[in-house]
Amino acid sequence: LQLKEDKIIGSYQHWDGYPSGLGYNLIDNWYRADKVEKAIMLGDASKWGQFIGEKIGFDNREADSYDYQNVYYGRDRGEKDCNHKVYTSEEAYLKNGFNSGEDYIYLGKMIGQKDYLGREQVTWFYAKYDMKKFEPLETVAIMDHIDDLKRHMKEQLKEVA
């Protein structure tokens, strides 16, 4: 997330970091800057859901909120050294944001986009490890998500036939 003073805060998210997965989740659920900042400040996560959530057993997949909330390495598993990172610029983020083997990194910016109530919201951008700059995320995430859904439906239809 790019903060007002242009520094960027970020954290690693392990599960399904592709535009059709995490990218789609970001544009669908993570458009309030205060919510995004709080989530990032909790550090590296196994997965991001629809909301931050409360401390939960890391492997407690039976918990009612497990499928919907974020699950963090520090808060939920007690790991150390998994705090958020601070980058001085987009260039620094592009250079150093792929240190955990990520294929994609994401950047939320406040560029004046508003929600239906007129409140400012985060606009998301992404970069693949071989890209030189961030590109708008929304169209790519939606199209990739649709492709994933089509593949899923094709598999379901094979099973029925």
Task: List the predicted regions and their residue ranges.
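Short, extreme N-terminal segment that most often corresponds to the first beta-strand
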Residues: 1-18, 22
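All-alpha amphipathic helical-bundle segments outside canonical DNA-binding/catalytic cores
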Residues: 25
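Low-complexity intrinsically disordered segments
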Residues: 28-161
